Amino acid sequence: GHGVEWTYSEGMLDEAHWPLEYPKCGGRRQSPIDLQMKKVQYNPSLRALNLTGYGLWHGEFPVTNNGHTVQISLPSTMSMTTSDGTQYLAKQMHFHWGGASSEISGSEHTVDGMRYVIEIHVVHYNSKYNSYEEAQKEPDGLAVLAALVEVKDYTENAYYSKFISHLEDIRYAGQSTVLRGLDIEDMLPGDLRYYYSYLGSLTTPPCTENVHWFVVADTVKLSKTQVEKLENSLLNHQNKTIQNDYRRTQPLNHRVVEANFMSRPHQEYTLASKLHFYLNNIDQTLEYLRRFIEQKIPKRKKQENWP
């Protein structure tokens, strides 16, 4: 193992320095990316993703706080067949979120520069390999089904109640619990027909460039309370709250992003949402500045009083 634990924004191995320990993180097909509608290539021949075994399953789902995120282990009876007929078996599902200030969103992929509140990743491996461990070393080994979360004045999303209520059982890094009877399909967007597709990488070290990404156009809706629970329940290895556990968007470098829809379905561009978007961007920028300054200032005493 590596002596130093990687992080997003603190210490020796923050995301700017990942490539020093994990060279692939400095590669040319990294994830996440900004999905720019004007550059996306429309490909109507991309068929809907075929999900099998994603519905209610009464078995056990181990859930772990791994110090970076909360991870749900998935049974290999869950699989996804993509448009070209490749079958991928599910391995685990995890989340990326913000929360370092009330307005900070934490999705990894952005759409036309807009960052969503949370991003959900369901990680799969190519069924032609015997295990995830084997597949993760292969060039066509992995696929991630990604979904973005919106929060407005939504009522509680009942499909997330059980999961969120058990976060307190895994407050500390390394803790695990077991959930019974989850419906993963219900935890995903209602409409899975439309998606963006591109070739990228894992968004955490070792950042291997063998991931076929499928980012669903439709979103998951959570209530503000649910989002705040996720943002404030878990502690990392330093016993600090896990927040802003997302990687910044990476250069596209001549890759092509395809989508099987023409424009973003039912996205209302109200003045309010535009304003929210700009405020959010300002907030993001301030947060990056804060991170940057925090690293440049010599550590006198523990700066616990930062905002």
UniProtKB/Swiss-Prot annotation:
Lineage, highest ranks first: Eukaryota, Metazoa, Chordata, Craniata, Vertebrata
Active-site feature positions: H68
Stretches assigned to the Alpha-carbonic anhydrase domain: 4-261
Sites carrying sugar chains: N50, N239
Family that this chain belongs to: Belongs to the alpha-carbonic anhydrase family.
Gene that this polypeptide is encoded by: CA6
Intrachain disulfide bonds: C25-C207
A Pfam family that the UniProt record links to this protein: Carb_anhydrase
Cofactor: Zn(2+)
Reported function: Reversible hydration of carbon dioxide. Its role in saliva is unknown.
SMART domains: Carb_anhydrase (SM01057)
Superkingdom of the organism of origin: Eukaryota
Protein name: Carbonic anhydrase 6
